[in-house]
């Protein structure tokens, strides 16, 4: 039986693990060969020392080797946050996914239930009537017929069951918050990824490059794992094999600046109702932040030339009813009914 203890000792001593060592350590954990105490100790040793790019890449390689895949078009993208930002905000990336799909870009959305917030992507989408436990074939059909499919992380990463108890007991963010957005079962090459802290912007952009992404924006919105309309968003963009960093304010793209309080969400049912309101065309601070993130996603997808163009397309997606139609189709297909 493989032993995690040498890797715990290495991490605890402050020594970085190579990509190969990191993959080996995660293989041990994901195959059920480590105790909950060992897993907790290893995760906290990495957290305290600070996870490195090779460690994250090795961990993702381990997760990807075990996942149940979903077939999606080559131009599909993911819009996802790491979670762990402790903000309790609305489900921005979930709402954004419908708007982007309504604008004509296939979305393979990867997400989970809340671990550190009151409502994760899966919680809100389930409250809307989407069957979050649909199988891989149904999700593939949802992407091709509705323009969007939701992949519930535990259904595709069943090996996570070995580490979930330790994560819940720790009650704090770990390397796994970073891994979810990097382990999309549809193996998308275009991503808009939100991170919970600015120090992860460039490292995650480098990991995505290492793992074969073509275009990606890694974003941090002044306390949110999304682009924000309540402050300044920092971006690390992977484009044409290069990584560049820049900042965006809502005013420079024609959006109203709001207060952080206006973006506060609630329980899943409340967030689902608010999400539906945005798709139905209601004006709000939630709509504005969704427009900003949708505009960025459309730039990443190659559908928009710039952020203002992307936002204009996002407005059209909502106001034409296209985004709402995507939601209705996804509900139907995920429950195995005709779209």
Curated annotation (Swiss-Prot):
Anthranilate 2 binds at residue 167. GO terms for molecular function: anthranilate phosphoribosyltransferase activity; magnesium ion binding. InterPro entries: Anthranilate_Pribosyl_Tfrase, Glycosyl_Trfase_fam3, Glycosyl_Trfase_fam3_N_dom, Glycosyl_Trfase_fam3_N_dom_sf, Nuc_phospho_transferase. GO terms for biological process: L-tryptophan biosynthetic process. GO terms for cellular component: cytosol. Its EC number is 2.4.2.18. Its cofactor is Mg(2+). It comes from the Bacteria. It catalyses: N-(5-phospho-beta-D-ribosyl)anthranilate + diphosphate = 5-phospho-alpha-D-ribose 1-diphosphate + anthranilate. 5-phospho-alpha-D-ribose 1-diphosphate binds at residues 81, 84-85, 89, 91-94, 109-117, 121. Mg(2+) 2 binds at residues 225-226. Anthranilate 1 binds at residues 81, 112. Binds 2 magnesium ions per monomer. It is an enzyme of class 2 (transferase). Keywords: Amino-acid biosynthesis, Aromatic amino acid biosynthesis, Glycosyltransferase, Magnesium, Metal-binding, Transferase, Tryptophan biosynthesis. The keyword Metal-binding applies. The keyword Metal-binding applies. SUPFAM superfamilies: Nucleoside phosphorylase/phosphoribosyltransferase catalytic domain, Nucleoside phosphorylase/phosphoribosyltransferase N-terminal domain. Pathway: Amino-acid biosynthesis; L-tryptophan biosynthesis; L-tryptophan from chorismate: step 2/5. Catalyzes the transfer of the phosphoribosyl group of 5-phosphorylribose-1-pyrophosphate (PRPP) to anthranilate to yield N-(5'-phosphoribosyl)-anthranilate (PRA). HAMAP family: TrpD (MF_00211). Homodimer. This is Anthranilate phosphoribosyltransferase. It comes from Brucella suis biovar 1 (strain 1330). The gene is trpD.
